[in-house]
């Protein structure tokens, strides 16, 4: 059976190739994961912040009905009851309005979709009013019956690919994606989201599904909806959650022919570097030399909703909002470097790793509160609103596809490079000051450092950098400064 599935996978490869295109609007790059936000709040954020600040896309939490769990943990969203679009984030009408409003301001929507499994035992009723009996594998809201699932068995050996793909992940009832009826229901669900104007999908737990089955599902999806500004013939961008740190039976290379993958090695490696376990000088060959998938197959991130809580991969090396200086440096590097498709995390604060989003009453999600400096309160972290991050999204948009040039390092933890002649960044992760004359590659003039401040008319709210006629500038980053990074670009010239 595995050989037959492999043949099907290869046959559909040409169809899948269209799924590497992010479908971003021209001149934009980078997406943000607004984790557990409500649809109405995301729509407003697209219009008021994401669009004006150059973000290209927003990843949203699962949109379909999920099991209601005691204490309302975040992970209940990953326990489907049906494919009805009804969650704590809102209903179908609100979701459709959000997608339309975001598309109108150039921000594409990417849905976190869960179809590896259905809810585990205890998930008997859902956010949309549906009921289920997970113990008997009955989910009338779809409907699914026991005929649509793999036999009950637990995953205990990640060196056994059959077990990983055919058994149950932490008790979640494992759907059989090789079943034609299951394929029909999944395609129907995804096509409905495409009709509503989404640009792509993050496929949860892709590692736990056979690549050949995924190839069939992806190959059957309709083209994107041209009513939402997509080019005729466009296909949904597919990014698959495949945790591959090496040493297991399943490899990300089995999935990169079908779509992009979540490159967890990027998160692990960038955390080690900016935590000081590896030196910044070694970043000179950042990319596939570090064991990453190809650039157009890699969705890259500093942290995600799983590994910031110690789940997934990376462990204690993962950087989160709780170590803000290093987190901002790592995020700035990710956005300054051309490798991969970057995704910015936008979190809610937590002390308990099961803790759900802020609520008004223990159940209904609370809206973020916005402060005058663009930051959030009310339990929301909103890293995407940190100046050091959103200004680097603008940096990335400004430099476009220009190559890395003028690399410099001090043989330790101070580095700098330009992106052609359009942007320049410098980093200091040493315990002493960076104070050097460096080649920026930029035209002569005075520039606003978009890390310490922002350009405002003809002035700068932060540090300024003067570039000489030879392209060189005196760069200073004190080891005790709040930010260990400096960035200038041609659109920040004063």
Swiss-Prot record:
Q: What is the effect of changing residue 398 to A?
A: In strain: Berkeley, JP-5, JP-35, JP-55, JP-60, JP-65, JP-70, JP-75, JP-169, JP-186, JP-190, KN-3, KN-9, KN-10, KN-12, KN-17, KN-21 and KN-23
Q: Which organism is it from?
A: Drosophila melanogaster
Q: Where is this site: Transition state stabilizer?
A: 306
- The UniProt record lists the EC number as 3.2.1.1
What name does the UniProt record give this protein? Alpha-amylase B
Q: What is the effect of changing residue 403 to A?
A: In strain: 1420#1, AO168, J87, JP-60, JP-169, JP-186, JP-190, KO123, KN-3, KN-9, KN-10, TN22 and TN256
Enzyme class at the top of the EC tree: hydrolase
Active site annotated at which positions? 204, 241
Effect in UniProt of substituting residue 121 to G:
In strain: 1420#1, JP-190, JP-169, JP-186, KO123, TN22 and TN256
What are this entry's molecular-function GO terms? alpha-amylase activity; calcium ion binding
Q: Which GO terms describe its biological process?
A: carbohydrate metabolic process
Assembly information from the UniProt record: Monomer.
Give the recorded effect for residue 121 to E.
In strain: JP-55
- Residues where chloride binds: 202, 304, 343
The protein's UniProt keywords, in alphabetical order, are: Calcium, Carbohydrate metabolism, Chloride, Disulfide bond, Glycosidase, Hydrolase, Metal-binding, Pyrrolidone carboxylic acid, Signal
Outcome of swapping residue 410 to S: In strain: Berkeley, JP-5, JP-35, JP-55, JP-65 and KN-12
List ligand-binding residues for Ca(2+): 116, 165, 174, 208
Quote the annotated effect of residue 11 to S. In strain: Berkeley, JP-5, JP-35, JP-55, JP-75, KN-12 and Oregon-R
**Outcome recorded upon mutating residue 121 to N:** In strain: KN-10, KN-3 and KN-9
Mutagenesis or variant effect for residue 288 to I: In strain: KN-15
Q: Which CDD domains match?
A: AmyAc_bac_euk_AmyA (cd11317)
What family does the Swiss-Prot or TrEMBL record give for this protein?
Belongs to the glycosyl hydrolase 13 family.
Query: Gene Ontology cellular component?
Result: extracellular space
Write out the catalysed reaction: Endohydrolysis of (1->4)-alpha-D-glucosidic linkages in polysaccharides containing three or more (1->4)-alpha-linked D-glucose units
């Amino acid at each position: 059976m595995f050989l037959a599935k492999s043949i099907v996978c290869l046959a559909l490869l040409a169809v899948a190739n269209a799924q590497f295109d992010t479908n971003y609007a021209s001149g934009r790059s980078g997406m943000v994961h607004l984790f557990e936000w409500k649809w109405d709040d995301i729509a407003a954020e697209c219009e008021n912040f994401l669009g004006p600040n150059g973000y290209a896309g927003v990843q949203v939490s699962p949109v379909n009905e999920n099991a209601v769990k005691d204490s309302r943990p975040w992970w209940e969203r990953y326990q489907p009851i049906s494919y009805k679009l009804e969650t704590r984030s809102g209903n179908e009408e609100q979701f459709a309005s959000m997608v339309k409003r975001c598309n109108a301001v150039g921000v594409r929507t990417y849905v976190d979709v869960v179809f590896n499994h259905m809810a585990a035992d205890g998930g008997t009723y859902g956010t949309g009013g549906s009921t289920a009996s997970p113990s008997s594998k009955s989910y009338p809201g779809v409907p699914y019956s026991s005929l649509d699932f793999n036999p009950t068995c637990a995953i205990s050996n990640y060196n056994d690919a059959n077990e990983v793909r055919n058994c149950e992940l932490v008790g979640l009832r494992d759907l059989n994606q090789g079943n034609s009826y299951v394929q029909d229901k999944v395609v129907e669900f995804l096509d409905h989201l495409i009709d509503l104007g989404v640009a792509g999908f993050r496929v949860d737990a892709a590692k736990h599904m056979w690549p050949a089955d995924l190839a069939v599902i992806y190959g059957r999806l309709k083209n994107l909806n041209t009513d939402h500004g997509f080019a005729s013939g466009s296909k949904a961008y597919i990014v698959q959650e495949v945790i591959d740190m090496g040493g297991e039976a399943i490899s990300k290379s089995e999935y990169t022919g079908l779509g992009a993958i979540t490159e967890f090695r990027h998160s692990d490696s960038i955390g080690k570097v900016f935590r000081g376990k590896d030196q910044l000088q070694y970043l000179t060959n950042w990319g596939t030399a570090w064991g990453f998938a190809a650039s157009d197959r890699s969705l890259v991130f500093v942290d995600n909703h799983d590994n910031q809580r110690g789940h997934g991969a990376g462990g204690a090396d993962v950087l989160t909002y709780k170590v803000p200086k290093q987190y901002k440096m790592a995020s700035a590097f990710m956005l300054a470097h051309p490798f991969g498709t970057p995704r910015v995390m936008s979190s809610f604060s937590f002390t308990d790793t099961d803790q759900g989003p802020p609520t008004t009453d223990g159940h209904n999600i609370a809206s973020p509160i916005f402060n005058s400096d663009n930051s959030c309160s009310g339990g929301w972290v909103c890293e995407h609103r940190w100046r050091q991050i959103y200004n680097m999204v603008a940096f990335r948009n400004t430099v476009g596809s220009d190559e890395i040039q003028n690399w410099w390092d001090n043989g330790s933890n101070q580095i700098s490079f330009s992106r052609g002649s359009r942007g320049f960044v410098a980093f200091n992760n040493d315990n002493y000051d960076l104070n050097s004359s460096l080649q920026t590659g930029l035209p002569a003039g005075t520039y606003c450092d978009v890390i310490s401040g922002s350009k405002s008319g003809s002035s700068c709210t932060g540090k300024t950098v003067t570039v000489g006629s030879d392209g060189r500038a005196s760069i200073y980053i004190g080891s005790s400064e709040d930010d260990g990074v400096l960035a200038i670009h041609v659109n920040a010239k004063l």
